[in-house]
Amino acid sequence: MNKGQYFWNELWCEGRISFHKEEVNPDLIAYVSSLNTPAKGRILVPLCGKSVDMLWLVRQGYHVVGIELVEKAILQFVQEHQITVRENTIGQAKQYFTDNLNLWVTDIFALNSALIEPVDAIYDRAALVALPKKLRPAYVDICLKWLKPGGSILLKTLQYNQEKVQGPPYSVSSEEIALSYQQCAKIELLKSQKRIQEPNDHLFNLGISEVNDYVWCIRKG
């Protein structure tokens, strides 16, 4: 287990998962139509944790594919929502699945790419910003390989003064987004908003006084 894997496993084992939200992300509800995903289309949720957003997408009629490093997160997800799953193990990857939900427990960088059928869209609420800068180019490349031509990514990022605090979540600039997805046909900024300070906000509690949130829709050519 490398340093990054140990870090995330430790957070889940100790229950330090303030990044997990109990409500469906309002930006997903507001902007899911921007993806133009066909009915019953396949949506990838990388680094999915136990996000309730996945259940919401399934209820909208989509087939959801989740990839998560920590098995505890997936087990909590299926238990908390009383989902009856089938199980499978392929190499180092473990699979929990139903007819419209396919959850992989593995390191996304080590997953045999052939195991993931091409997807119509990707929903990234907190995956890119969970990765240090040196890993983000490889992550983007992996996701784009799984995305069908013409498919879209709904991506949430944030910016703050990272000289004061090291992530995760990491600050990702608009310039990095433009560079990372320059091969795509379209990069559209759907939302830019200064975050309102809340008592349980991790970054504000660490002394960051200003955080800006962004929502992007990126279309592959």
Curated annotation (Swiss-Prot):
Species name: Legionella pneumophila (strain Corby)
Keyword Zinc: no
Predominant location category: cytoplasm
InterPro entries assigned: SAM-dependent_MTases_sf, Thiopur_S-MeTfrase_Se/Te_detox, Thiopurine_S-MeTrfase, TPMT
Places the protein is found: Cytoplasm
Ligand binding (S-adenosyl-L-methionine): W12, L47, E68, R125
Family statement: Belongs to the class I-like SAM-binding methyltransferase superfamily. TPMT family.
GO molecular function, one term: thiopurine S-methyltransferase activity
GO cellular component terms given for this protein: cytoplasm
Key word Transferase present: yes
Listed name of the protein: Thiopurine S-methyltransferase
EC identifiers of the protein: 2.1.1.67
GO BP of this protein: methylation; response to metal ion
Catalytic reactions of this protein: S-adenosyl-L-methionine + a thiopurine = S-adenosyl-L-homocysteine + a thiopurine S-methylether
Major enzyme class: transferase
Assigned keywords, A-Z: Cytoplasm, Methyltransferase, S-adenosyl-L-methionine, Transferase
